[in-house]
Regions:
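Bacterial N-terminal signal peptides
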Residues: 1-5
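Short amphipathic alpha-helical surface micro-motifs
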Residues: 7-8, 49-52, 67-71, 83-85
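SH3-family beta-barrel domains
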Residues: 9-52, 61-63, 108-110
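Boundary regions of SH3-family modules and the immediately adjacent low-complexity/disordered segments
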Residues: 11-27, 77, 84-110
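Conserved beta-strand/loop element in small beta-rich adapter and peptidoglycan-binding domains
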Residues: 55-73
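Surface-exposed patches in mature extracellular/periplasmic domains of secreted proteins
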Residues: 72-80
Length: 110
């Protein structure tokens, strides 16, 4: 499962990169739980995220919203063995105020 996307470069994510996301989890503990489910299967992760949205532990946006990467927390291999990143993110014009956490695949190549 991945919540985020962006176009440009085949690099790893890094601080100050711009990313769009339509789902953000509000705590590090919650996003780590999502990542654990994502290592098992897409179905596990998807149903788990739906429950988190209902509980208010994650939020979704009507359309993808731009954020800035504050920190790469860790990388892992998802259920399809793809390089996947857990990112702490801020609003673009925020002064070091983390908004939440998201999951993204390695940055795609155009």
């Amino acid at each position: 499962v991945f919540f985020s996307s962006v176009a440009s470069s085949a690099e790893a994510w890094k601080k100050d990169d711009t990313i769009t996301s339509n789902i953000v989890c509000l705590s590090e503990e919650t996003i780590l739980e999502v990542a654990r489910q994502d290592t098992i299967s897409f179905e596990n992760a998807s149903s788990f995220v739906q429950a988190l949205l209902q509980q208010g532990r994650c939020v979704s946006f009507m359309r993808p919203t731009e954020f800035q990467v504050d920190k790469v927390l860790l990388t892992y291999k998802d259920h399809l063995k793809r390089e996947t990143f857990i990112l702490r993110i801020n609003y673009i014009f925020s002064d070091n105020n983390p908004f939440g956490f998201t999951i993204a695949l390695q940055r795609p190549t155009i």
